[in-house]
Amino acid sequence: MLKITSLSIGLLLNDILSGDTALNKMGVRVFPPKVPEGERMPWIAYRRSDLQQVAVKARNDVYDSVVIEIVVHAQKYAQCIAISEAVRNVMEDGPYRYNDVTGRSIEMGQTLFEGCDEDADLDAYIQTLRFSAKVTSK
């Protein structure tokens, strides 16, 4: 049986973000990289922007270092910041595990906040948060 790897991190991110109480109370919808046209705000979209395999020589082990971007869109600046704070809190609250239907799993531990950019367009305030995470297959 094939194991699942950090290529499946989006499945775990969906579970984490969609299941967060604070984000749900704010009415935030969660999407993978593609958001449906005309989706009403607030929403967040997540994506894996980089993945590097890391060998741990001392333990003869391997893990993946994954860079994750989460983009927050909201109509009001204060709402965008509040959602971004909730995202940061939930992302730094791990470790998290995703189990597929066959019992295979990945674990996302040690998640670090790497930075954030903000922007605006005609109808939205935007925050792009970046995290790096250590992901292992189980």
List each model region and its residues.
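Short, cysteine-centered beta-strand-loop-beta hairpins and adjacent loop/turn segments enriched
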Residues: 53-55, 75, 137-138
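Short, solvent-exposed beta-strand/turn "edge" segments of beta-rich domains on protein surfaces
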Residues: 57-62, 120-122
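Oligomerization/assembly interface segments of phage tail-like spikes and tubes
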Residues: 61-78, 87, 125-135
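Short beta-strand or tight-loop elements
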Residues: 42, 66, 109
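Small/polar-rich, solvent-exposed N-terminal microdomains that initiate assembly or binding
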Residues: 1-60, 82, 94-104
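A general boundary/transition motif marking the beginning of the first structured unit of a protein
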Residues: 1-5, 75, 119
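Acidic-leaning, charged glycine-interspersed low-complexity segments
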Residues: 89-138
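Short amphipathic alpha-helices in soluble, non-transmembrane regions
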Residues: 83-89
